[in-house]
Amino acid sequence: MEQRRDFLLMRNIAFALTALTMFGAGRAAAYDIVNRWTSTQLDGGNLQRGDAVTLRWSIVPDGQSYTRSNNSQLVQFLDDGWNVPAAQRVPSFSGRPWWGVMNQAYQQFGRVSGVTMVYIPEQNGAGVDTGFEGDIRIGGENIDGTPGGALADNTFPNDGDMRIDTTRETDGSVGSYFSAEPGLRNLVIHESGHGVGLGHAQFVNNSAKAVMEGGLRTDIWGLQFDDVYALNRQYGDPKERNGGNNSHATATMLGSFTTTGSISIGRDAVDSVVEQFDDDWLGIDGTSDTDWFRFTVSSPSVADIKLTPVGPTYETVQQGVFNAAAMNDLEFQVFKAPSLGLVDGAAETGVGLAESIDDLLFSTAGDYFIRVLGRQDANQFYQLDLSFNDVPVPEDADFDGDLDVDGEDFLIWQRGAGAGTTLSQGDANGDSLVDGLDLEVWKEQFGMLVDPPNPSAGTVPEPGTLLLAAPLLGLVMAVRRRAA
């Protein structure tokens, strides 16, 4: 059983930072990864890097033994610290205030990664053994006999059991790290970080913060960017939970969009600060990972699609400057459902640079897919943006249909100005109005030939009508002056 004791988690933070230099320098680094779970009670075995996991966690009843202690005493210790009334000290722990703090701590893992934590009681409300134990079991005992010693320690996968120090203060009280939410919450998250395979992190000049730093921080809410990055490298992003989105059959549904619709996802990875309920994370954890998304367009439309690598930049003691937005060269393709016919793709840039397709035409309503993948074996968070618009109506100032744009067309526009609604009445831009915008189209196209049967041949000037340009433009100005 591989074990790592948190000598760094001391009650005195100043002492902890000193101890960090003494004991932690050999291992501390950004996204320090030791190993991961390869088998769990619910997932079975043969789990690989990038696979999501569901881990059961449980609390060892007092007086029972487990891998970390022959006589766990955690429950009474926490009950005393949280002033739980005697009538509420029942065999079921889920009504305790400290249990709620632990549960909130474990819920964060599922919001930011492919790790799902599920509580399972080891005894029922009558105190009878349920026959179940967690993949991660939490208990406690007097670890070193001194109030200034270690707060807790934990084992790495495939074990993950936690032992919390139940040593009381010199006055017999329970220390504040165990009896208030910030301390207990981040202690549980930190130790469980070891329990899922993470090591310690260490930053230069406070350029970032992490719950996996050696000293217990209470100025953050649990897992921060560096912690989340490591979790996603090992277990994938939150979309990998419940079957994942690694194929078109399990694609994440983005929604149904009209020609004014838009969506932006993956926005929580843009900076190093993670709040309690941040759950908008998208990432490619390596070359073996692909992310599929599905969306519906309700009518023919055009779309702008952009894939942007995101992440903060900070400095670590061991690795130097770490730019989390430039870890992988991402690309994407768009497919038509259900045939998976390729519509378009974008793979033109490089590591850390955005890929985009502008004005992509979806000529028919229906379902489409986007597939995202990376070329490097590294985790890369990204943001995906889609915005939809109407299919542009071709501008046409040949109002009389004689295949050229000339003075006759100007006269048609002049007669229809303010009243007309169709092309034959001077509506050049298809907005069912004949106004100054249509006149601008006529001016841009004046002197051009219109050749619908072979549009690829382009348009050429009509020399005979170019001579009309000067007097006609003068006439336009005169009309404007009269209108004024």
Please report, for each region that a protein language model flagged, where it lies by residue.
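Short beta-strand-plus-loop segments that form exposed binding edges in beta-rich domains
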Residues: 370-378
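Extended, low-complexity, turn-rich repeat/linker tracts enriched in Gly/Pro/Ser/Thr and Asp/Glu
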Residues: 310-327
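Alpha-helical segments with a strong preference for the paired helices of cellulosomal dockerin domains
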Residues: 100-108, 181, 185-186, 195, ...
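C-terminal membrane-anchoring or membrane-association module
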Residues: 476-484
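Beta-sandwich interaction modules
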Residues: 353-362
